[in-house]
């Protein structure tokens, strides 16, 4: 509370996030979010708790604008969340890993910063990246490749902090996190939540979806939202007081005790136990019927909820982000894509050796040698060679572009908040594939035509023909990568 007083004086440009009568239901289902209203201010660390499938992630998606509620509204300083200026003040760290595994820790942050701050020089961007690495205790691993979640080169806790850093480098006013402690040890979990607590001291509003917090983590939260089955909010208030609130309704004998008098610990699991308590039948056996249903808990919450007043629009906090031009975005996307490919040695070997090897196989299979010696004009299989060359160009063009977009889907989900040019991203992919297809077509012609005995007179014609065929296959592969939902489905289609 003392810190909050100092923070209010230090951060005069405060934000107010409000929700009024939010209603959302999934198609053919009552699950979603029901009758939820709230006021949140900057400098708060808010926890969303509840059992599995109660709608915690759905609520986060409503708050960050990914899901539009059927009724009600979410506003930032009185401005609707759909306002582009509001979108740029929001940071979202989903549960999925959003790192580019081939790049280093520094490079992941470097390219994100370049896409956010066109008004800064490269030296200023580098200083900003180094500062965030120091703040999040990642400077010692700055030159390590991130690796995949399965084949790790950095720890799980470091990966979580790096995912958070990708959002913090944009300096958002509001930061949402979906299960930031999942899969982490208790020590790493506390480090992550302490990091988020520090962000609230800098004037940010942080909202966290969390499942099973420890006692130490639970006591760090300033505000608690509890959801029950079906998406019903059942509590909004002080985390410590939540335990006595539910004990009192459930008629516990120690309903005034929330903290252990001996060790000072809190048991957050007790809240979920009380909420989900089952009735006992006449034989003393536990039934599957709850003592208090989710709708009854919700009615109690609504009865105790204060009346919210309408908020008049006030100026939004200044936003220091500046998008690069469309051309600059194209260059950054292209550079990032090339850097990613160059660090993947396996990819390079396949991309550069695939077509020469296929050229050798095709040429040897179609090289017809009669008894009186080989002659190109006497080769009965020349038409077959031409046909198979086109098939190879089509196959390599499809295979090399098949994963270009689908593997970036989680990354694009995060960059959606940056409001970058989709055309620049797609153009960078097409230009890269155009170049790699030119190299592959050239290698096939040099090796295959040499073995089959075709002279250099028609070299340019052969190259343009196979290059165009391969590039058309590239475009088809990009369409498949964008349209289909799994890599398996893409390769089956190919």
Give residue spans per PLM region.
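Topological signature of polytopic alpha-helical transporters
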Residues: 2-37, 42, 51, 71-76, ...
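Helix-to-loop junction immediately C-terminal to a conserved catalytic motif
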Residues: 64
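ABC ATPase NBD Q-loop/coupling interface
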Residues: 68, 73-86
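Q-loop/switch helix immediately C-terminal to the Walker
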Residues: 96, 101-118, 128
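ABC ATPase C-loop
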Residues: 167-168
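Conserved catalytic motifs of ABC-family nucleotide-binding domains
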Residues: 171
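Catalytic Walker B motif of ABC-type/P-loop ATPase nucleotide-binding domains
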Residues: 175-179
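Membrane-spanning alpha-helical segments of multipass transporters and channels
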Residues: 234, 246-264, 277, 342-494
């Amino acid at each position: 509370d003392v810190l909050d007083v100092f923070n209010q004086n230090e951060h005069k440009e405060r934000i107010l996030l409000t929700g009024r009568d939010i209603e959302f239901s999934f198609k053919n289902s009552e699950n979603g979010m029901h009758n939820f209203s709230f006021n949140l201010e900057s400098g708060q660390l808010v926890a969303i708790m509840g059992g599995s499938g109660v709608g915690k992630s759905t609520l986060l998606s409503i708050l960050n604008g990914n899901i539009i509620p059927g009724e009600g509204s979410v506003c930032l300083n009185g401005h609707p969340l759909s306002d582009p200026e509001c979108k740029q003040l929001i940071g979202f760290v989903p549960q999925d890993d959003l790192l580019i595994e081939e790049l280093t820790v520094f490079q992941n942050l470097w390219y994100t910063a370049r896409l956010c701050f066109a008004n800064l020089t490269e030296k200023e961007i580098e200083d900003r990246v180094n500062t965030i690495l120091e703040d999040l205790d990642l400077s010692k691993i700055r030159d390590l490749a991130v690796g995949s979640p399965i084949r790790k080169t950095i720890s799980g806790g470091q990966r979580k902090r790096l995912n958070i850093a990708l959002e913090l480098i944009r300096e958002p006013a509001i930061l949402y996190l979906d299960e930031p402690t999942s899969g982490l040890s208790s020590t790493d979990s506390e480090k992550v939540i302490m990091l988020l607590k520090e962000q609230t001291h800098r004037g940010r509003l942080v909202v966290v979806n969390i499942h099973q917090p420890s006692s130490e983590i639970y006591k760090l939260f300033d505000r608690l939202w509890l959801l029950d089955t079906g998406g019903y909010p059942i509590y909004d208030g002080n985390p410590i007081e939540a335990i006595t609130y539910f004990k009192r309704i459930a008629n516990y004998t120690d309903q005034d005790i929330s903290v252990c008098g001996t060790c000072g610990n809190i048991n957050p699991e007790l809240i979920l136990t009380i909420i989900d308590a089952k009735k006992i039948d006449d034989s003393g056996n536990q039934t599957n019927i709850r003592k208090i249903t989710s709708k009854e808990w919700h009615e109690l919450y609504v009865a105790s909820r204060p009346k919210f007043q309408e908020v008049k629009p006030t100026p939004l906090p200044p936003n220091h982000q500046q998008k690069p031009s469309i051309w600059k975005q194209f260059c950054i996307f292209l550079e990032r894509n090339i850097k990613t490919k160059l660090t993947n040695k396996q990819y390079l070997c396949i991309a550069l050796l695939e077509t020469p090897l296929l050229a050798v196989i095709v040429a040897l299979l179609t090289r017809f040698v009669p008894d009186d010696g080989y002659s190109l004009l006497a080769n009965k299989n020349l038409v077959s060679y031409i046909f198979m060359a086109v098939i190879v160009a089509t196959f390599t063009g499809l295979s090399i572009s098949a994963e270009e977009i689908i593997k970036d889907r989680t990354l694009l989900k995060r960059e959606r908040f940056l409001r970058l040019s989709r055309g620049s991203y797609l153009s960078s992919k097409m230009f890269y594939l155009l170049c790699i297809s030119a190299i592959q077509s050239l290698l096939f012609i040099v090796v295959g035509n040499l073995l089959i005995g075709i002279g250099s007179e028609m070299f340019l014609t052969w190259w343009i023909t196979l290059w165009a065929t391969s590039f058309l296959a590239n475009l088809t592969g990009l369409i498949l990568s964008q349209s289909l939902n799994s890599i398996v489905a893409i390769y089956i289609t190919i």
